[in-house]
């Protein structure tokens, strides 16, 4: 399905593959009920450039998410344990209300980073993944939304 099909009522959802900010900019204001996303954790994990792109800290990107959400709409954004706080600040700076956090607890942690030359792990092994719970401010009262 396409975004247009959802907006017209012909479909209930759409999965879109593409640059998220470019796609968000094609969407009208206040047309989305909720957003669940898992941006890069900005750790540069295993030397990967995509995981150190600055996307999670990009206030302008979060402002676009805020723009397309309906008043009172929620954002759930997964983050890394060492970088969650910076992402939460960027989300708040974009205009969201930080409502809470959820911690997805794993039975075992993520694999440790490894410097093969040293023969040992070089990072902690977290066993949870923090999730920011944020809300677009309401227009008026809770009952009116």
Where are these regions (language model features)?
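Core catalytic lobe of class I
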Residues: 2-145
């Amino acid at each position: 399905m396409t975004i247009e099909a959802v907006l017209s009522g012909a479909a209930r959802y759409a999965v879109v593959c593409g640059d998220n900010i470019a796609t968000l900019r094609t969407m009208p204001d206040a047309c989305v009920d909720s957003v669940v996303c898992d941006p890069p954790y900005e750790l540069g994990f295993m030397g990967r450039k995509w995981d150190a792109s600055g996307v999670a800290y990009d206030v302008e990107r979060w402002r676009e998410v805020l723009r397309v959400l309906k008043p009172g709409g929620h954002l759930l954004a997964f983050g890394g344990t060492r970088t969650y706080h910076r992402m939460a600040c960027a989300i708040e700076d974009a205009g969201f209300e930080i409502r809470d956090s959820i911690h997805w607890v794993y039975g075992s942690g993520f694999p440790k980073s490894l410097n093969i030359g040293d023969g040992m792990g070089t990072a902690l092994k977290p066993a949870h993944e923090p999730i920011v719970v944020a809300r677009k401010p309401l227009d008026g009262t809770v009952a009116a939304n």
